[in-house]
């Protein structure tokens, strides 16, 4: 894991456009569509040597990629996440701003699927 502070969203886009960032890793979300200037963000993503999207489902950001690209499917919060240390949970916020643990109830589509966190820590 990085030991120094990274970029915020705007700084990341500027660094990609300037060629200072060559790899983009998106953990969930729809980065290109969620930023204030989507056309500029799409150009920044195209400037990357590699874009990696770790996602539960396809979205528009997957259509804009760097020179090389990976789309890695990951478990959603409804999927059971079994790790060597035991079953895992994610936190969710309800409409009353209360945080709860959510454990999936569905068998994953494949034994090869991992959670987004498992991709980051393996």
Q: How should each PLM-predicted stretch be described?
A:
Residues 1-122:
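Non-catalytic alpha/beta scaffold blocks inside enzyme catalytic domains
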């Amino acid at each position: 894991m990085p030991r120094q502070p990274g970029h915020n969203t705007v700084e990341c886009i500027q660094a990609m456009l300037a060629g200072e960032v060559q790899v983009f890793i998106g953990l969930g979300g729809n980065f290109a569509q969620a930023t204030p200037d989507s056309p500029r963000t799409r150009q920044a993503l195209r400037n990357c040597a590699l874009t990696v999207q770790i996602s539960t489902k396809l979205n528009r950001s997957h259509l804009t990629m760097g020179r090389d690209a990976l789309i890695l499917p990951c478990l959603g919060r409804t999927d059971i996440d079994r790790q060597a240390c035991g079953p895992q949970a994610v936190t969710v916020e309800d409409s009353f701003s209360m945080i709860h643990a959510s454990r999936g109830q569905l068998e994953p589509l494949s034994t090869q699927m991992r959670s987004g966190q498992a991709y980051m820590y393996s």
